[in-house]
């Protein structure tokens, strides 16, 4: 996690969360973001850990508390690609997408992921640039 103070609040970067809601909650409790803070999340919110759905809920809630700038990670890109392509869905599942689906407690699969989660993923940017920093997900 990188942190910088800016004129209108703090600029904070948070790296790969990978479905670990408790870790994200601990970070957010420690930094206690406010409306003047900008948080850049660097992608890979989902897969591998047990709580991907909850992580997306936390990030959506966080966007109401501060300026949130979500960056697209390769795991989110795989999930988005899997919506319309069965081969992409198989690849995504083999890279941790099965854990993401399990976090929704749905047997029916990808069709039961809430629309607000898809909207959040679609809002993710490829990068964010400030006067001093360029933020991106480095796995490309």
Cite the ranges covered by each PLM segment.
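N-terminal active-site segment of His-dependent metallophosphoesterases
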Residues: 1-56
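Residue-level preference for short coil/turn positions at secondary-structure junctions
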Residues: 7-8, 35, 64, 129-131
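Beta-sheet entry/capping signal
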Residues: 10, 38, 67-69, 133
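Short hydrophobic-aromatic micro-motifs
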Residues: 13, 128-129, 133-138
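Histidine-centered divalent metal-coordination motifs
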Residues: 18, 74-75, 137
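Active-site neighborhood of divalent metal-dependent phosphoester bond hydrolases
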Residues: 48-130
């Amino acid at each position: 996690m990188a942190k910088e103070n800016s004129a209108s609040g703090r600029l904070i970067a948070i790296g790969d969360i990978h479905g670990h809601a408790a870790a994200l909650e601990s970070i957010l409790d420690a930094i206690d973001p406010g409306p003047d803070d900008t948080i850049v999340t660097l992608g890979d919110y989902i897969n591998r850990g047990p709580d991907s759905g909850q992580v997306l809920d936390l990030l959506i809630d966080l966007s109401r508390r501060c300026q949130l700038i979500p960056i697209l990670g390769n795991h989110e890109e795989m999930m988005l690609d899997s919506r319309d392509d069965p081969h992409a869905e198989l690849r995504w599942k083999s890279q941790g997408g099965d854990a993401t689906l399990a976090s929704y407690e749905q047997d029916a699969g990808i069709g039961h992921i809430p629309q607000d989660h898809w909207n959040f993923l679609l809002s993710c940017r490829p990068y964010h640039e400030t006067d001093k920093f360029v933020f991106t997900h480095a796995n490309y």
